[in-house]
Swiss-Prot record:
The gene is RTNLB14. This is Reticulon-like protein B14. It comes from the Eukaryota. InterPro entries: Reticulon (IPR003388), Reticulon-like (IPR045064). It is a multi-pass membrane protein.
Length: 215
């Protein structure tokens, strides 16, 4: 137990640096806050809405045009009744104004910043400066293209979105344990390979030399 505690303490400083690095790799802004569940209400709402959309279109197989028209009709009737009741002063709450319904420029700016960030990252990967990252991107895209043959586009997007919303949070919560387990597995694998080399690989040239002398 003492060894485990010492090795866990040894990884804490590097773990905090990796956590900050992962947060900044995701943009370090609102998108990263959502992925790391900094605002649990907002992250939970987005996940719930995306899950509802996936359930309606993939499980229930609800027609998209029908769904869109019914949502618009629902909003029209809600605002119509709300405006009528608000004007007759039956309730104190007034319907939202047109300015309340407009999408703010900051939201559009956030969206376009994320698109620009993605384009810049894609360009950096394609330049070949980091061959390891380039290889990882090519393999990941190839795996996604193969997996896409077995899932619909919406299901695949849902799986990717759920992964993006859960993996960073779980990694941040159990990072020390995962880092310790990964480093310990790496050391054990290295010892096993060294043992295999010393007992099997290193004996092959000796066996070849003996056969040559006997010949």
């Amino acid at each position: 137990m003492a060894v485990f505690g010492y090795e866990m303490d040894e990884h804490r400083a590097s773990s905090s640096r990796r956590r900050r690095s992962l947060y900044h790799n995701l943009g370090g802004g609102r998108f990263a806050d959502i992925m790391f569940w900094k605002n649990k209400k907002e992250s939970g709402t987005i996940l719930g809405v995306f899950t509802l959309i996936w359930f309606l279109f993939e499980v229930v197989e609800y027609p998209f045009i029908t769904f869109l028209c019914q949502i618009l009709l629902l909003f029209i009737f809600i605002f119509l009744i709300w405006s009528y009741i608000g004007s007759s002063q039956l309730i104190q709450s007034k319907p939202p104004s047109i300015n309340d319904l407009r999408i703010s420029e900051s939201n559009w700016r956030f969206l376009f910043n994320k698109i620009n960030w993605f384009i810049i990252k894609l360009y950096d990967i394609s330049s070949g400066k980091d061959f390891r990252l380039l290889f990882l991107a090519v393999v990941s895209l190839w795996i996604l293209s193969v997996v896409g043959n077995y899932f619909s586009s919406l299901t695949l997007l849902y799986i990717v979105f759920v992964g993006l919303e859960t993996i960073p949070m779980l990694y941040e919560q159990y990072e020390e344990e995962l880092t310790y387990a990964a480093s310990k597995s790496g050391r054990d694998m290295k010892k096993l390979l060294n043992k295999f080399n010393s007992k099997v690989i290193n004996k092959i040239p000796k066996a070849q030399a003996k056969t040559r002398r006997t010949m």
